[in-house]
Regions:
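Glycine-rich anion/phosphate-binding loops
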Residues: 19-22, 61-62, 84-100, 129-130
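N-terminal amphipathic alpha-helix/helix-capping segment at the start of soluble metabolic enzymes
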Residues: 1-20, 29
């Protein structure tokens, strides 16, 4: 499914189940099970590559490499967790660009401070609204409408 058709699919306004995957094999299994989309979380990469909790230890490169290996093998869209964008607004823009090149259909960016913590862990901090707006604006300035339209979403860490 191409990104434009994923956008059309999301516009249908019904639930899209996107199971969490952590490598190309788990992605293939999920695709063969019939799922329409997949979700690559920062936690899954931290657990499987580092054997650690999701506390901001993974790098942009580790996530982009894992994403590229997955999208090389599956045809369904992959939503990827960009954590906090791996830095400031310019880093976040670079992250979105890199993830788009690696085949992401959608990128999720959190509004946490550093060090970030997995959503279910205590001790999270939220960045100032202006800082998060700067990150989102940087992403939107990069993601102009195109045949490879990349959607960007935000998950509030306070939820």
């Amino acid at each position: 499914m191409t990104n434009p058709s994923f956008k059309t699919r999301l516009a249908r306004n019904d639930i899209v189940l996107a199971p969490g995957v952590y490598d190309a094999l788990s992605a293939l299994v999920a695709e063969q099970a019939g799922f329409e989309a997949l979700y690559l979380s920062g936690a899954s990469i931290a657990y499987t590559r580092l054997g650690r909790s999701d506390v901001g230890l993974t790098t942009f490169t580790e996530v982009a490499d894992t994403l590229a290996r997955i999208t090389e093998r599956v045809r369904v869209p992959v939503i990827v967790d960009a954590d906090t964008g791996f830095g400031n607004a310019l880093n976040t823009q670079r992250t979105v660009r890199g993830f788009e090149r690696a085949g992401a259909a959608m990128v999720q960016i959190e509004d946490q401070g550093f060090p970030k913590r997995c959503g279910h862990l205590d001790g999270k901090t939220v960045v100032p609204v202006g800082e998060m707006c700067g990150k989102l604006k940087a992403c939107l300035l990069y993601t102009s409408p195109s045949p490879r339209d990349l959607s960007t979403s935000r998950m509030p860490s306070s939820a």
